Amino acid sequence: GAASGSAVVGMALAMDTKSKTGSNYRRLQRFIKEINWTNTSLIQMILKWLKLDDGPYTLLIDRTNWEFGKKKINILMISVLYEGYSVPLGWSLLNKKGNSNQGDRWDLLNKIIDKVGAGKIKYIIGDREFGGVCWYNYLNDNGITFVIRIKENQKVYHDSQKISVKNIVKSNSRKGKHSNNKKYKYGKLEVYVSGFRFKNDKNKSEYLIILSQEKITDVIVVYGQRWQIESMFKNMKSNGFHMEDTHLQKDSRIETLIGLIALSYSWMLIKGLMIKKKNPEIFICKAHGRPSKSVFKAGLEFIMRALYTNNSRDFARAIKFLSCT
């Protein structure tokens, strides 16, 4: 919509020192200038805003490709779950095409661990790209429970016998279960294998198979939270911030923009949740019972309205949490 399409324009104006769009933008300018634009500082700030300082955290890891004008950017990102929504927490630009490697993930996750401590991280959830024996060992050594989807052709060991994970899931399915209580060996780790068969978009059978070193009763539900990071990417790319409409070329400036996006996304999500708690009825369409508006969109519209109308009261309410109090 118009409001969401103008979000990135609004942020650009807020950073433009020549802008004369009203006192609200100048107030936002001052706030932005005072931020220490380093990845680790933003991690701490976002967690404080979300009131998640003490954990435990459920982290989501994913990678996405964005185009900034003619420049293609490969971004590895870790987000944190907040009231069922994904909020960006750490990111890095990969100077290559394709998948991340285990070193890329170590470097990014270490930035978060350095700030919050591994002991506060309950889960890290990822899809098939984010496997690997060394990666699993690293997570396990840090006491972090991984919930990772693996490829159907992967093998594990049980009583010194090599077994296909696909066959394990097939066997469980015949018993009407998603998992069993058996421990399998994957590398040096003892792991649990869970999953189910489903029909993909092409109506072909496919298996969703999850590996974890802990027995998780509702592991399918836990893994299902991974989709929130994809929803977040969608909002950032088109539904909300239109990041791909910007024309930045320098990596340092793109990193700064992603930082600003992360802060803004947190801001809008928190405001949207506040609106939902106060007026839940506005999110329900009586005709079909589905939400008529997303929490993110509600927060975005409120903040953009406060910025553009120069409404001091609304703006004060919108930025209340920026002081971290």
Question: Model-derived features: where do they sit?
Answer:
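Single, function-defining residue in the core of a domain
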Residues: 1-8, 19, 42-44, 53-57, ...
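Short acidic/histidine-centered micro-motifs embedded in hydrophobic/aromatic stretches
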Residues: 14, 31, 239
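Active-site-proximal, Lys/Arg-enriched surface segment
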Residues: 25-85
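Short, basic interhelical loop/turn and adjoining N-cap
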Residues: 14-27
